[in-house]
Curated annotation (Swiss-Prot):
Its EC number is 4.3.2.1. The gene is argH. Disulfide bonds: none annotated. HAMAP family: Arg_succ_lyase (MF_00006). This is Argininosuccinate lyase. Transmembrane segments: none annotated. It comes from Clostridium botulinum (strain Alaska E43 / Type E3). GO terms for biological process: arginine biosynthetic process via ornithine; L-arginine biosynthetic process. It is found in: Cytoplasm. CDD domains: Argininosuccinate_lyase (cd01359). It is an enzyme of class 4 (lyase).
Length: 465
C-alpha cells in the first residue's frame, strides 16, 4: 500500500518502485515504528483528535502486530515502499478502516526521524556496553602486566622502556574518549521530533510533550524545519564510530606486528586465528587484519552522509533516505569489530621474556644515561651529545651500554660512577618515571584505579541500565 497517489493518473514504474523503496533497509526499525505509532495514537485519543475508543482499537491492533512480528507470524512484505507504509497497511488489514486514522497529524518526514532516533538511542546504549566490556578486558590485562617491560616506540624505532600495562592503558584512554563521544551523540539524538509534520507542524492540537514522555525522550525539538531535515545526530554518531574503528585499527596494526616472528611479543589464541590453504605452518591474525580493513568501510559511511547532506536545502529531501544504510552498516561493523577484538585481546598469550629482551636491545636506556649525567651536574644538551657518542661506539662494537666497563664510560665523562649501572637498569628506567601518566608501578596503578572508577561510573548510569 502506498501512502500517497491520489493526485497521480498513472502508476509508478516498477523500476522506480524498486529504486524508491527502502523496505530492505528500514525494516529493522519495525519495533521503533510501532512504538512511535503507539505513542502517537494514544496522544490523538487524549487530545480528542480521535475518540478514545478509536485510539484504543489502534493501539490494540499495533500491539498485536508487534507481537506477531516478534514471533515471525507476520513477515515483512518487501514489496512495500518502506516500513511505515507496511505497518499502516497491516494495521488497516487487521482492524479495518480505523487504521486509516493513525496518520492523522503526522507525516512520514517526522515519523522516519522519530523511528531513527528511537533505534539509534538503543543502538548507542548497546555500543557503549560493548566498549565498556573492551575496557574491562584491557583493565584485567593491565593488572596482570604492571611489571612486564617492553620497548616503547617513536617513529617505529625503539625509544624508551615502558610496560605492557602502560601501553594497554593508552588504548583504554582512547576508548574512554570514544565513550564520551557516544554519550554526546546520545544527547543530540535524545530530542523528540514527532509533531513537526512534513515541515510546518500541524493544525491539530497535538501534545508533543506527552509523546516525548511516553517514548522516553528528555526534550522535544524546537523548530519543525530543522527537525525533519536534521541528520547531524547520525553524522555525529558516524564520526564517533569512525574514531572507534581508527583506535581499533591502530591497536590491530600493533597486534599484527607483535605476532610476527620478528617481534614475537604475543601469540593469538587458535580460536582467533586462521590458517593458509597452501602453507601448513601459517597462523594468521585475520581478525586484526579485517578490523584494519573494515575501518575504511566505516570512514566511507561517514563520508557518504556528509556528502549527501552538504547541498540539501530545507526541509526534507529524498536524499536523506541514504542515511540509514550508511548508519546501519557502520553500527553493524563497529559492533562486531568491538566484540571480536575484545575476545582476541582477552585470549592472547603474552611473551614477557621476548618483550623484555627486545627492550634491552636498541639502547632504550640512553635517555636515562643522559639524565644520570644531568643529575650529576652536566647540562642536558652536553649530556645528550656524550651519550650519542657512547651509543655510536656501542653500535660499532656490537655492545649494549651496560656492557661497557666503568673505565670505558669515564673516557667519555669523568662524572660516571659505579651507580650508573643501577640508573640504566630497565626496571629503574621505568620506576623512576613516577610522573602521572608514566609507566612506573605507582603511576600505572593510579591509571588502573581511574579506569576502574570510570567503568563503575558509567555502568551505574541509569540511561544505560
Amino acid at each position: 500500500m502506498k501512502l500517497w497517489g491520489g493526485r497521480f493518473k498513472k502508476g509508478t514504474d516498477e523500476l522506480v518502485n524498486d529504486f524508491n523503496s527502502s523496505i530492505n533497509i528500514d525494516s529493522r526499525m519495525y519495533k521503533e515504528d510501532i512504538e512511535g505509532s503507539l505513542a502517537h495514537a494514544s496522544m490523538l485519543g487524549e487530545q480528542n483528535i480521535i475518540s478514545k475508543e478509536d485510539s484504543l482499537k489502534i493501539t490494540s491492533g499495533l500491539l498485536e502486530i508487534l507481537k506477531r512480528m516478534d514471533n515471525d507470524v507476520i513477515n515483512i512484505d518487501l514489496t512495500s515502499e518502506d516500513i511505515h507504509s507496511f505497518v499502516e497497511s497491516t494495521l488497516t488489514y487487521y482492524i479495518g478502516e480505523y487504521g486509516k486514522m493513525l496518520h492523522t497529524a503526522r507525516s512520514r518526514n517526522d515519523q522516519v526521524t522519530l523511528d531513527l532516533k528511537l533505534y539509534l538511542k538503543k543502538a548507542l546504549v548497546k555500543l557503549r556496553k560493548d566498549i565498556l566490556y573492551l575496557e574491562e578486558v584491557l583493565l584485567e590485562k593491565s593488572k596482570e602486566h604492571i611489571s612486564t617491560i617492553m620497548p616503547g616506540y617513536t617513529h617505529m624505532q625503539k625509544a624508551q622502556p615502558i610496560t605492557l600495562s602502560h601501553h594497554l592503558l593508552a588504548y583504554a584512554e582512547m576508548f574512554k574518549r570514544d565513550i564520551g563521544r557516544i554519550n554526546d551523540a546520545y544527547k543530540r539524538t535524545d530530542e523528540m521530533p514527532l509533531g513537526s509534520g512534513a515541515l510546518a507542524t500541524s493544525t491539530y492540537p497535538i501534545d508533543r510533550y506527552m509523546v516525548a514522555k511516553d517514548l522516553g525522550f528528555s526534550k522535544i525539538t524546537l523548530n519543525s524545519l530543522d527537525s525533519v531535515s536534521d541528520r547531524d545526530y547520525v553524522i555525529e554518531t558516524l564520526s564517533a564510530l569512525s574514531l572507534i574503528m581508527m583506535h581499533l585499527s591502530r591497536f590491530s596494526e600493533e597486534i599484527i606486528l607483535w605476532c610476527t616472528g620478528e617481534f614475537n611479543f604475543v601469540e593469538l589464541d587458535d580460536s582467533y586465528s586462521t590458517g593458509s590453504s597452501i602453507m601448513p605452518q601459517k597462523k594468521n591474525p585475520d581478525v586484526a587484519e579485517l578490523i584494519r580493513g573494515k575501518t575504511g568501510r566505516v570512514y566511507g559511511d561517514l563520508i557518504t552522509l556528509l556528502t549527501v547532506m552538504k547541498g540539501i536545502p530545507l526541509a526534507y529531501n529524498k536524499d536523506m533516505q541514504e542515511d540509514k544504510e550508511a548508519l546501519f552498516d557502520a553500527l553493524d561493523t563497529v559492533t562486531l569489530s568491538l566484540k571480536t577484538f575484545a575476545g582476541m585481546i582477552k585470549t592472547m598469550k603474552i611473551n614477557k621474556d621476548n618483550m623484555k629482551k627486545s627492550a634491552a636491545l636498541g639502547f632504550t636506556n640512553a635517555t636515562d644515561l643522559a639524565d644520570y649525567l644531568v643529575k650529576k651536574g652536566s647540562y642536558f644538551r652536553d649530556a645528550h651529545g656524550i651519550v650519542g657518542q657512547i651509543v655510536l661506539q656501542c653500535i660499532k662494537d656490537n655492545k649494549m651500554i651496560e656492557d661497557l666497563t666503568l673505565a670505558e664510560l669515564k673516557e667519555y665523562s669523568p662524572t660516571f660512577e659505579e651507580d650508573v649501572y643501577d640508573a640504566i637498569n630497565l626496571y629503574t628506567c621505568v620506576e623512576e618515571r613516577k610522573v602521572i601518566g608514566g609507566p612506573s608501578r605507582e603511576s600505572v596503578k593510579f591509571q588502573i584505579k581511574e579506569l576502574q572508577e570510570f567503568i563503575h561510573q558509567f555502568k551505574g548510569d541509569e540511561i544505560y541500565d
